Every structure is written in C-alpha cells, then in structure tokens.
C-alpha cells in the first residue's frame, strides 16, 4: 500500500507491507498535515498479526485524537494504553512549518533520519524497550530544519545498509521510495515507512 500527500510545505509518501502469510499488518501509522504543521506516527506492535495490530492501531488512534498535545504527552498516553495489550514500539514526529522546527520522540526500534541539503543528518539513537503501560523514560528532540530537508521514519521491517545515501540522492519522495524497493522483497516482517520532503 502506498499513500502520497502534499501541500505547499511538504511532500509525503507512506509505504506499508504485511509480513508474508499475514492478512493483517502489525504496524500502524497516522499522518496529518495542514498549512501550519505535520504530525505523524509509526507504531510497530510486538509480534505480528491481529494482536500486534491491536496495539499499534491503539497508538494510531490516540495520536489522531490528541494531535494538538505536545509529543511527550501523546507518547505517554500511548504507553498507558498498552496496559493489558501486547505492547508496541513507536515514533511520533511533529513539524512546525512556520518556525521550521521539528519535535521527535520514540521508544524502541522505529527509526528516524532527517537529512539536510547542507549535508548534515539528524539520527537520534533510539531508546531501547517498548511501550507496555509500565513507567517509561522518554527523550524528546527539538531542532530546526533547512528548506529541502528529507526524512524517513521506518519500522525494523525495512533494513537498509546506508539509508542516508538514499535520502541524499533522491530528488523526490517517489524517487527515494523507488530506490528502496529492493529492500522490501523479503517480507520477513511487517514493514512501514513514511518519507517526507520539506519545502
């Protein structure tokens, strides 16, 4: 499944594949952009199939319902919602177009990389663990971005040796997605990524 959206501030592309043999994807995502900001989230439910989807879909719904709150408040809501569920790893990204600023928070192995036209990359080390309803520490990153910056948020179903080179070379989100196709064929795990290019 591929979903493409754009406005004057951003172009985005979402790509998702189920694990081979599974009818339900254990990953979920949410993305919404208006003329002021983007909020997006990717969640990877532990395991695969319907129980994994139950956890990741709960995170997607919470991000959608509480999108106006700050990133750390949203991720804490997501953590609390994982009580009596299998649990999930998750990343949440908010981008303020007017201030050219982004805020990012994650727990677990959903990765985020932002590459700037000047050659700098922002690649926060993930906090180990997963959202489970138990007390959890979070690390929130806030930084500014350059016009033309490109980013990807992806679950561990996408395993690319040097993903920054794809962000660097690709002229558009579609071109970057095409360059990643060769890494989406194994289907050993659910796979989800969100690509973005900031104007």
Swiss-Prot record:
Superkingdom of origin organism: Bacteria
Signal peptide: none
Top-level EC class: hydrolase
InterPro entries documented for this protein: PPM-type-like_dom_sf, PPM-type_phosphatase-like_dom, Ptase_RsbX
Residues covered by the PPM-type phosphatase domain: 11-198
Function: Negative regulator of sigma-B activity. Dephosphorylates RsbS. Plays a role both in maintaining low sigma-B activity during growth and in reestablishing prestress sigma-B activity after induction. Could have a negative feedback role by indirectly communicating sigma-B protein levels.
Protein name: Phosphoserine phosphatase RsbX
Taxonomic source organism: Bacillus subtilis (strain 168)
């Amino acid at each position: 499944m591929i979903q493409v959206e754009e406005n004057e501030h951003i172009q985005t592309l979402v790509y998702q594949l189920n694990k081979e043999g599974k009818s339900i994807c254990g990953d979920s995502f949410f993305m919404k952009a208006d003329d002021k900001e983007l909020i997006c989230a990717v969640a990877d439910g532990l395991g695969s199939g319907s129980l994994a989807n139950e956890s990741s879909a709960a995170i997607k719904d919470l991000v959608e319902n509480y999108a106006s709150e700050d990133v750390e408040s949203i991720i804490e809501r997501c953590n609390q919602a994982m009580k009596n569920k299998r649990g999930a790893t998750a990343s949440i990204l908010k981008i303020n177009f007017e201030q050219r600023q982004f805020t990012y928070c994650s727990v677990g192995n959903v990765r985020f990389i932002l590459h700037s036209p000047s050659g700098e990359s922002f690649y926060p080390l993930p906090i180990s663990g997963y959202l489970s309803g138990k007390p959890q520490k979070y690390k929130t990153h806030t930084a500014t971005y350059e016009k033309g910056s490109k980013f990807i948020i992806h679950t561990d179903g996408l395993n690319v040796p040097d993903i920054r080179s794809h962000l660097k070379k690709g002229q558009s989100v579609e071109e970057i997605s095409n360059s990643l196709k060769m890494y989406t064929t194994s289907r050993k795990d659910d796979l989800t990524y969100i690509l973005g290019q900031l104007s």
